[in-house]
């Protein structure tokens, strides 16, 4: 019984500390992570549907981006996604990318 209480207390404390860390990120960092996760999910969907990397690049070239750095970053994310042997669903890729991006941003602080 005591072990169960300690495990529950530890879980609650870890959850609260992670939430507190996530709140330290600025709006821009969250936007960049969200945007990147959308690009990664789209690339994974294209890959799983059979679209070639060349075709995915052409779609990105035709797309309008609000910031100059976004086009090349999207190309890099797409290429890394295509080079990965992963067959995960796009929603799983999106979640994983976002979590790792947030973790990376927090580690840089």
Regions found by a protein language model. Name each.
Residues 20-59:
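N-terminal secretory signal peptides
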Residues 1, 20, 107-109:
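Short intrinsically disordered terminal tails
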Residues 15-19:
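N-terminal signal peptide c-region/cleavage motif recognized by signal peptidases
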